[in-house]
């Protein structure tokens, strides 16, 4: 973007890609590498009479009838973020499949979150290679790199995962936060409509909700190096709980 060229090189800005048949380009998402210049950019927008709104890591403003959303990302996660936000809501759809397998998939990488009830014990960063995640889910890396011409292309790509389970996408099966958010998303709702009458031939066992243990074993099967640390942390948590129970029982 020429407007930001005084602050960033082309390698530090990425205009997210949308399906090529998309007709409505009323907005533009731009991934920004690093946030060290954010205040400087916002001061420039103010002095140039471009009012902006801040929401977390996003700064939004109007430019030549476009809404521009600047998404400021950690430099270490820049490449992953570019892929995550490309192709409409694909990152969110991929995240649904990842979650049912025991992973946490976001714009900053693929993680495994060890919990004790609702308390997070540790979050393990597994990979910051988006193509590795695509491969892990049984999706075609070359197809992803080529991109998508239509919603149908995009949706069929998601359906091609052997781990695809339509139940995990239904709004009634989401928690309240995700349900409220995804109900507003055009691509997500089009996807729900698209899969209504589809039939599937997928891996046995992945057409149901996996248990915590099954998810854990799946994660370990793909990332065996974290198993020992996870087991050690679980043992320490259990030991702490036993000690607390004895103290409270006195």
What are these regions (language model features)?
Residues 62-64, 71-221:
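Catalytic cores of NTP-dependent nucleotidyl/adenyl transfer enzymes across multiple folds
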């Amino acid at each position: 973007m020429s407007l930001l060229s005084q602050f960033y090189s082309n390698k530090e800005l990425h205009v997210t890609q949308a399906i090529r048949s998309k007709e409505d380009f009323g907005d533009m998402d731009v991934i920004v590498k690093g946030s060290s210049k954010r205040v400087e950019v916002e001061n420039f927008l103010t002095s140039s009479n471009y009012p902006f709104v801040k929401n977390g890591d996003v700064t939004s403003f109007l430019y030549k009838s476009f809404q521009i959303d600047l998404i400021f990302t950690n430099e270490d996660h820049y490449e992953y973020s570019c892929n995550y936000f490309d192709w409409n809501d694909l990152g969110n759809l991929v995240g649904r499949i990842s979650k049912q397998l025991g992973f946490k998939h976001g714009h900053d990488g693929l993680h495994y979150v060890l919990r004790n009830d609702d308390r997070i014990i540790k979050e393990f960063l597994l990979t910051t290679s988006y193509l590795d995640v695509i491969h892990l889910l049984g999706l075609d890396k070359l197809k992803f790199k080529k991109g998508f011409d239509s919603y149908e292309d995009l949706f069929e790509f998601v359906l091609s995962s052997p781990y695809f389970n339509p139940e995990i996408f239904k709004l009634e099966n989401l928690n309240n936060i995700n349900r409220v958010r995804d109900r507003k998303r055009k691509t997500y709702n089009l996807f729900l409509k698209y899969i209504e009458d589809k039939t599937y031939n997928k891996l046995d066992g992945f057409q149901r909700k996996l248990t915590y243990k099954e998810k854990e074993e799946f994660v370990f099967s793909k990332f065996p190096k974290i198993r020992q640390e996870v087991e050690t942390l679980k043992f320490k948590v259990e030991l702490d709980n036993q000690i607390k129970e004895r103290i409270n029982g006195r």
